[in-house]
A protein has these predicted regions:
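Aromatic-lined substrate-binding rim segments of carbohydrate-active enzymes
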Residues: 56-126, 144, 186-203, 207-209, ...
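Structural recognition of the beta-strand scaffold that forms the well-ordered cores
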Residues: 37-43, 73-79, 83, 114-118, ...
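Surface-exposed, active-site-proximal loop segments in enzymatic domains
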Residues: 47-54, 81-99, 123-140, 173-179, ...
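Bacterial N-terminal signal peptides
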Residues: 1-6
């Protein structure tokens, strides 16, 4: 699918932004003729709970004072459409919501902070968790979103405190023909919104995010693995910035959160784990199959596996559980990949899930049903195992563990236990092969590689890029796990590449500088010190 617009196309009528406005110029943002690097913090404003009234507990003016003192110059300010428009009365706008926004703009202006207004929760639903398909399937939702942005632009066209407008947070468009067609759908909506904004406002920056994933309209499956630069869509506008988010490695930054599939996990940074990005699945070879009717731990293994696809540069251990049933659970433990040379001599045995080593497996389900977690109920060699439960279609838990060297062969082995699995189910261990654009250990080089992908896109397109979100969850700062080192390395990597950034978030139960614990508002003092040491120039 070819997009109808290139990144090189500019607006037919470039405008003079004036000294007080931030605007895009080449690959930079500038203000008053000088380069402007965004150093921002997110304010979440309770958008995920879909509030109908302005949030009171998130922050007050003192938050802007505090951020300025730490060296921040901006806030990515999250919006939920419901503060400004009622579903029962579309296209009529609520002054309560705009009064709240006016108040925050005054607070920001008084403390030397600028705002990026970000539509985090648009009509049709929050995008990031994949529940916002109605934005893409119902044209009226898209029309309402464009109209709301037009109203915002009309009101704030002359407001220099506002840097610009983030059209949709982490879009996950649904294609009309297939998943990849979602790129066209997002491009058309982004252009529709931009055109509506430009009816009233020619001076503020438009922030266009790359897609988080694209969804197939027939199967509902999401393609998460488009090449990085193909995840961006161009718009016709000379004052646009292209936005990406990074939480690499996800298994570290999201550790301990059930909603992210990382419940019960603990990981440190830096580490010598392998993290593959831009991965494309190539093939699998079954190593051995477990019996569905047995509740004992069964040894599962197979013969030597040769990798035949020449594009393979990474291999994974995969625990597959297909069609086990809604009430069934299957477990796997003591999982290994044995590596052999060309003549069949054992080189080494690599642990994937053992008493001493706990791999960061990812879960996938063909129809979205079931779960893949770490269980403390059973274990073959300890009180821990992988657990897949409630899957009615194909599902697996996978760990990309090794870089592939041509000529090497592999054997996968481990133990599996079943509970209530259907007799027709497929429960197996297998070796999967992948091609990855990048394979890095969990170090500063990994973070820098993620940022350099965006830098390369900026050089190729000639447009500015912006890291709209990065952050480490609160569990990353426990027990010497290295959260402060991750944040420091991320900030320095972004600065090294000359890319503006925004930390997620000021007040948030999972990622906040402030969060709630036992009914009390807690500040992450370690994180605050990182900001004081590294945000200011």
């Amino acid at each position: 699918m070819a997009l109808a617009v290139s990144f090189a196309v500019a607006s037919a009528e470039p405008t003079d932004a004036g000294d007080g406005f931030v605007r895009a110029e080449g690959r930079e943002l500038v203000c008053g003729g000088e380069p402007y690097l965004i150093k921002g913090m997110a304010m979440g404003n309770d958008v995920w709970n879909n509030p109908s009234a302005a949030p009171a507990a998130d922050h007050d003016e003192s938050a802007f004072q505090e951020l300025a003192a730490m060296g921040f110059n901006s806030v990515r300010f999250y919006l939920n459409y419901a503060l400004f428009e009622d579903d029962a009365d579309p296209y009529r706008y609520r002054e309560e919501g705009f009064g709240w926004l006016d108040r925050n703009i005054r607070w920001a202006r008084a403390n030397g902070i600028r705002l990026i207004l970000n539509m985090h929760y648009p009509q049709g639903g929050y995008q990031s968790q994949g529940n916002g398909d109605s934005l893409w399937k119902e044209p009226e939702n898209r029309n309402r979103l464009a109209a709301l942005w037009g109203e915002i632009a009309r009101r704030y066209a002359d407001e220099e405190t506002v840097i610009g407008y983030g059209l949709v947070n982490e879009p996950m468009p649904v294609g009309e023909t297939d998943a990849r067609d979602g790129l066209r759908v997002w491009q058309e909506l982004a252009q529709q919104i931009t055109d509506e904004i430009r009816r009233y406002d020619t001076r503020h920056v438009i922030f266009v995010e790359k897609v988080l994933g694209v969804r197939d309209p027939k199967t509902g499956e999401t393609d998460w693995n488009l090449p990085f630069e193909e995840q961006f869509v161009p718009i016709r506008d000379d004052n646009a910035v292209y936005e990406f988010h990074t939480y690499d490695p996800h298994s570290f930054t999201h550790q301990g959160f059930d909603w992210a599939g990382r419940g019960g996990t603990a990981e440190t940074y830096p580490n010598d784990e392998l993290y593959a990005s831009g991965v494309s699945w190539l093939a699998f070879t079954a190593a051995g199959r477990a019996r569905a009717g047995s509740t004992d731990w069964q040894p599962v293994s197979g013969g030597l596996i040769s990798v035949t696809d020449p594009n393979t540069n990474a291999v994974a251990l995969c625990f597959q559980a297909s069609g086990i049933g809604k009430d069934a659970s299957v477990y796997a433990d003591d999982l290994w990949i044995d590596v052999f040379d060309e003549i069949g001599e054992l080189i080494r045995s690599v642990p994937c899930e053992t008493a001493e080593y706990h791999g960061n497996f990812s879960f996938w389900a063909q129809n979205g049903e079931g779960s893949g977690t770490v269980s403390s109920r059973y274990g073959y060699d300890d009180r821990r195992s992988l657990c897949i439960k409630g899957t009615t279609g194909d599902a697996n838990m996978t760990l990309i563990r090794l870089e592939h060297t041509p000529g090497q062969r592999y054997r996968v082995r481990g133990y599996v236990r079943t509970e209530g699995a259907a007799a027709s189910s497929l429960i197996a261990l297998r070796l999967d092969s992948y091609h990855a654009q990048s394979i890095q250990e969990g170090s500063r080089d990994l973070l820098l590689a993620s940022v350099r992908d965006a830098q390369a896109f900026s050089r190729k397109s000639g447009r500015p890029v912006f890291c709209g979100e990065f952050g480490a969850g609160i569990h990353c700062f426990e027990e010497g796990r290295g959260g402060e080192r991750w944040v420091t390395d991320s900030i320095e990597a972004l600065k090294e590449c000359g890319i503006g950034f925004n930390y997620h978030a000021y007040y948030d139960g999972a990622f906040g500088l402030y969060y709630e614990k036992n009914g009390k508002r807690i500040r992450n003092d370690v994180l605050e010190q990182v900001f004081r040491d590294h945000i200011a120039d």
